[in-house]
């Protein structure tokens, strides 16, 4: 199933690019880098961030959960957030989003918490406010059932739980290029790294998958071209670039123009040779 393959890209690229034993930054720190606040309403701010961060991409447009099962690998649903969220306290929700753990301490799987560890408290509060505003709908979703394929990859260390991925994050990736590029790095870490890996080098996430490009390719884009890519999904040469085009239209068009410019500036600087 295509959706399941997309989810596995992030987990596989983490395994391929991260060194083990690296301690993550403490979740919940009051980061100084934040997404733009274009509304004083926390629910509206959280709604925008939920789109940028991809909540509906995995949990569905109504956040009622989706079936990501793959025969022979796993039977797995994303949670129906409209049913799950009311039973969590705010700290428990933050721990689920940033740390990949349920309220009972058990691990989530394929929740990309490693992307969200650095999200500022004010932004996290807004996301939680938005999630709490959603009316209950649909049934609760079942816990995952791992079949032979998943069990083998778990045993081999190729498929990891969300908290295991959090524990392996190297906080220097994507590269820290200084305060001037901090916003771009912050956004890239929470979004682009999901498919292109924490070092943004791309690659083939698992056998048979389409290779993800090294994001230093963005050095070939000017501001107008990059705006078109991230808002309309049209790459240089009037091309539709598959998953990237879908993600741009579904997520990155909700970034502000200044946020998209910050991403481009960061990627341009990243592509420059180091002395």
What are these regions (language model features)?
Residues 1-44, 133, 138, 272-275:
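N-terminal export/targeting leaders of redox proteins
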Residues 25-26, 32-34, 73, 107, ...:
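A short alpha-helix capping/helix-coil boundary motif
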Residues 36-37, 43, 60-95, 107-120, ...:
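Gly/Gly-Pro-rich "capping" loops immediately C-terminal to redox-active cysteine motifs
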Residues 91-98, 102, 115-141, 224-229, ...:
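C-terminal capping alpha-helices of c-type cytochrome domains
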Residues 123-183, 262, 266:
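Extended surface/linker regions that mediate inter-domain or inter-protein docking
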Residues 47-74, 99-107, 134-139, 185, ...:
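Periplasmic/extracellular electron-transfer cofactor-ligation site
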Residues 27-51, 153-188, 275:
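Electrostatic cytochrome c docking/interface patches
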């Amino acid at each position: 199933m295509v959706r399941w393959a997309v989810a596995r890209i992030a987990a596989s690229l983490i395994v391929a690019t991260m060194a083990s034993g690296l301690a993550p930054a403490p979740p919940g720190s009051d980061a100084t880098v934040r997404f733009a606040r274009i509304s004083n309403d926390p629910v509206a701010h959280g709604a925008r961030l939920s789109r940028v961060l991809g909540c509906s991409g995995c949990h569905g447009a109504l956040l009622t959960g989706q079936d990501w099962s793959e025969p022979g690998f796993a039977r797995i649903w994303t949670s129906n957030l409209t049913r799950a969220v009311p039973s969590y306290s705010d700290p428990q929700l933050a721990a689920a989003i940033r740390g990949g753990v349920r309220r009972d301490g058990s691990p989530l799987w394929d929740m990309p918490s490693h992307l969200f560890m650095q999200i500022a408290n004010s932004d996290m509060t807004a996301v939680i406010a938005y999630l709490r505003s959603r009316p209950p709908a649909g049934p609760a979703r079942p816990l995952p059932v791992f079949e032979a394929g998943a069990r083998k990859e778990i045993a081999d260390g190729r498929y990891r739980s969300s908290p295991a991925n959090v524990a392996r994050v190297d906080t220097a990736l994507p590269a820290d290029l200084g305060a001037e590029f901090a916003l771009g790095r912050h956004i890239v870490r929470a979004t682009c790294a999901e498919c292109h890996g924490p070092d943004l080098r791309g690659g083939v996430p698992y056998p048979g998958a389409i290779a993800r490009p090294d994001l230093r390719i963005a050095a070939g884009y000017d501001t107008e071209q990059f705006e078109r890519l991230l808002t309309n999904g049209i790459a240089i040469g009037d091309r539709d670039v598959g998953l990237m085009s879908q993600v741009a239209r579904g997520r990155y068009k909700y970034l502000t123009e200044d946020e998209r410019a910050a991403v481009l500036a960061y990627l341009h600087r990243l592509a420059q040779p180091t002395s």
